[in-house]
Amino acid sequence: MELKQIYDIQNLKLRFKDKKALEIKTLKFHNGLIYGICGNFGSGKTSLLKILAGELKETNGSVLYQGNKFKRGFFGKIKKHNDIQYLDANLLNSSLTVEQVVKKNFPKKTQQIKSRHFTTFQMESVWKTPLNLISDGERHWLKTIIGVEKDQRVLLIDDYGLSIDPRTEIILRKKIIKMNNILGTTVLLSSGSDYFLKQFASVIIYLDNGHVSKVRKGFKKNSNNRKK
């Protein structure tokens, strides 16, 4: 059965003054898949995610979400969709503790999240710690937990796998895959390397200097990779 498109990009251009950040002729994302967006520093990964999240306005071109352009307010500001979640560790309020961030996002299930994602994985030591005192890896753990606990149609995570060890990445990967399987969430993950992405993303899009250099099929759900 053919998957429905959730994003459709045509002739996208993004510029910051005289600097070209993105120039993509055509790119489509389909509902319910996990996508990896890979590229070096300055390739346009973060800018692309922000445009797809409604955080950033393109200079030219068309970006459709479920067949429609993002709505804009009186001053041209994009009205964000409630069913799109964009996560960047730098967006988290560093003056709050981990507990306060979780409670702010999930007031009714704070203790459940503590037990499920922190106590179980020996991360309880960071629970009362302000974000500006935890490691980069712990910040990325927290942002991913926020993402998988929210029932979003689309989840976009910037810098996936950054500053975390392979064991922790496997744990987070399983949580993302579970969410994708159960809820059908479309997931877009950006990374400077395709090492982790190739192991579970359905499609990997490679960016180079703001252009799509190649698109490759990734992991197949029904493959024989089931050994434990």
Language-model-detected regions and their locations in the chain:
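Helix-to-loop junction immediately C-terminal to a conserved catalytic motif
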Residues: 53
